[in-house]
Amino acid sequence: MSKLTTGSFSIEDLESVQITINNIVGAAKEAAEEKAKELGPMGPTAMAGLASYRSWNLLLLDRYEPVLTPMCDQCCYCTYGPCDLSGNKRGACGIDMAGQTGREFFLRVITGTACHAAHGRHLLDHVIEVFGEDLPLNLGESNVLTPNVTICTGLSPKTLGECRAPMEYVEEQLTQLLATIHAGQESAEIDYDSKALFSGSLDHVGMEVSDIAQVSAYDFPKADPEAPLIEIGMGSIDKSKPLIVAIGHNVAGVTYIMDYMEENNLTDKMEIAGLCCTAFDMTRYKEADRRAPYAKIVGSLAKELKVIRSGMPDVIVVDEQCVRGDVLSESQKLKIPVIASNEKIMMGLPDRTDADVDSIVEEIKSGAIPGCVMLDYDKLGELIPKIAEVMAPIRDAEGITAIPTDEEFKVYIDKCVKCGECMLACPEELDIPEALEYAAKGSYEYLEALHDVCIGCRRCEQVCKKEIPILNVLEKAAQKSISEEKGWVRSGRGQASDAEIRKEGLNLVMGTTPGIIAIIGCPNYPAGTKDVYLIAEEFLKRNYLLAVSGCSAMDIGMFKDEDGKTLYEKYPGTFAGGGLLNTGSCVSNAHISGAAEKVAGIFAQRTLAGNLAEIADYTLNRVGACGLAWGAYSQKAASIGTGCNIYGIPAVLGPHSSKYRRALIAKNYDESKWKVYDGRDGSEMTIPPAPEFLLTTAETWQEAIPMMAKACIRPSDNNMGRSIKLTHWMELSKKYLGVEPEDWWKFVRNEADLPLAKREELLKRLEAEHGWEIDWKRKKIISGPKIKFDVSAQPTNLKRLCKEA
């Protein structure tokens, strides 16, 4: 082979010559070096793969041991099965019950991750097509725009186009993760847990890309603590106007409907309202300048079937995620057209993407089709308002609704034979027979009370031998309260600004702000929507920082105090103690985890890029935070919570969530699990059992409250912070459980840690019950605590972070 030499030649006289330049020698290296200079310091795990976080994950899983709650004893994954795995038996492929249960949980986590990532991909591609890849990311007064992206990939995108790389990274890793579920792949439960944690971190990347893309492109509020207040509830809808109802999570198509309404002066002539997270994002559209909003929120996922049965919508447009599988069949009964606007949910409807808008309207008006698929958003924007205008008078004239008349109501009540099948089928175990029995005697308040607790699943109706439309009966009994159902919720503000993080970071790390309480997730509550309101109210009164999102954020806004004010009207939307900030829809959850990460990056000056273990170690030991997904039902909720767990942020779930099959709970009595390094010299130091779980469930909201307060205690709390946190935890335990916690003394390092109002009493108890030596003249603890307080200690789980390592 001849040796290549350098030189030059002229192409001026050459004809019919095609020159292809592949890589310019040295150019890629130079570009990479320039990019590295721009990004700054880089941690060890940029563009992490399946094994990159394994050592950190196993460290977490060693302390927070998986507690498995399998749903059944069988595995039905392949044609060898079904295999009985009970009694420590293994399946034909060799997998045991632990491995199979780990696989089941992991499958739910990657499903949730894929859902958010696919949402982000669709949204990102669409806004790039419309607004161009050079559109800057504008999230408000922030320089740290993408903490989750930066931690996992090492990248810090500044434009829409630069968001493609992290999106491609998530998609590639999801393919690798999905492959591990195949028969004959991973079988160790502990490694499925590790992979689940990795998938959770990817989920927060996908969510972050989704929300920063729409915040930037659609002019959503940008880190705005005074984002507009939005009307919520069925009572907020003007029933004299045609009603468009949007259901789902991807707002891209709905923005075209709103544009058409604005351009054609229809915003005061018809109502547009949403269910689930599309509802939040349509109320954020073009609200960066705080214009008067006109879009409304009907409610959460639990309201979907109730709204359809009411007959109020004149057209329903669905996009993706959290859309009931019976939306079309239920809507057809009431002549409500359904338009599918996203490839992920097409409902078997005819595709009319290439058809003329007016011809589609005519088909729907005549009843030739019950709805259609419409993937052309320009046409969608015109189609939906036109259908609403045409169908509203037709449906009004026929008085279409599933709500029974007074006569029908009486007949249905009298048909009940008290067999109890409905109660057995109900996920909430509602005593429907008893309520119907009282109703038969003329007392309807019991039926009315079930309206808020009912999650609208319709399982009761399907087992009723007398074919009573139970959901309709409940709605009939609650007509008055439904008509008055009106609250206020703050539109999603987006992320916490860098300035807010700098100001509040010290309070969070020292513990003087007791903690961040994040109330997120779905409406599968065990005892009605008011639970999340009561939890939020309690923590706000105690100056915790509350971050909320999704369906839970909606339900918090549905209740008012004795002065007629919602929590959103009473408390500021700032990232500070006593603040109630609604970040927005489900994908905005990335801003909640991102806030904890930004405390490490901005306040503590830790390197974010490619540095997950160090950031997670910081939040685990220093940032008091706890999540609550009280009504979690979906795979997305599992992936969101698991993504918090890898960062050392614990989460409490409602009682239904044991069906996810896995919890992460430490043994608070095993002292060997509560040893860390002191970053100053690498010596071993003992810490209190805090937090004592990463993922667990509670049976009641009264149990959850003190559990969450305790979960905000951190090893690095200073004396004032520990005293404040112990005060709240002990008071809340006494208030809601009737007893003080039995292990409060384990968190006392010296007398300054004790709650100020009860210091002398607690010193006496420490002396009498635990044998601690007290100097009563100075009221100081002489001996007793196993944990010594050292204000300069640097607790860390990572040996490499120690100065003498």
From Swiss-Prot:
Pathway membership, UniProt: One-carbon metabolism; methanogenesis from acetate
Reaction(s) this enzyme catalyzes, per UniProt: CO + 2 oxidized [2Fe-2S]-[ferredoxin] + H2O = 2 reduced [2Fe-2S]-[ferredoxin] + CO2 + 2 H(+)
SUPFAM superfamilies reported for this sequence: alpha-helical ferredoxin, Prismane protein-like
UniProt keyword list: 4Fe-4S, Iron, Iron-sulfur, Metal-binding, Methanogenesis, Nickel, Oxidoreductase, Repeat
Gene3D superfamilies tied to this protein: 3.30.70.20, 3.40.50.2030, Carbon monoxide dehydrogenase alpha subunit. Chain M, domain 1
Binding site for [4Fe-4S] cluster 4: 426, 454, 457, 460
Cofactor: [4Fe-4S] cluster; [Ni-4Fe-4S] cluster
Protein name: Acetyl-CoA decarbonylase/synthase complex subunit alpha 2
An individual GO BP term: methanogenesis, from acetate
UniProt-recorded Gene Ontology molecular function terms: 4 iron, 4 sulfur cluster binding; anaerobic carbon-monoxide dehydrogenase activity; hydroxylamine reductase activity; iron ion binding; nickel cation binding; peroxidase activity
Family: Belongs to the Ni-containing carbon monoxide dehydrogenase family.
Entry-linked PANTHER family: ACETYL-COA DECARBONYLASE_SYNTHASE COMPLEX SUBUNIT ALPHA, HYDROXYLAMINE REDUCTASE
Binding positions for [4Fe-4S] cluster 3 per the UniProt entry: 416, 419, 422, 464
Residues engaged in binding [4Fe-4S] cluster 2: 75, 78, 83, 93
Catalytic activity, EC: 1.2.7.4
Domain comment (free text): Cluster B is an all-cysteinyl-liganded 4Fe-4S cluster; cluster C is a mixed Ni-Fe-S cluster which is the active site of CO oxidation. Cluster D is also an all-cysteinyl-liganded 4Fe-4S cluster that bridges the two subunits of the CODH dimer. Contains two additional 4Fe-4S clusters, dubbed E and F, that probably transport electrons from ferredoxin to the B cluster.
Subunit relationships: Heterotetramer of two alpha and two epsilon subunits. The ACDS complex is made up of alpha, epsilon, beta, gamma and delta subunits with a probable stoichiometry of (alpha(2)epsilon(2))(4)-beta(8)-(gamma(1)delta(1))(8).
Pfam families: Fer4_9 (PF13187), Prismane (PF03063)
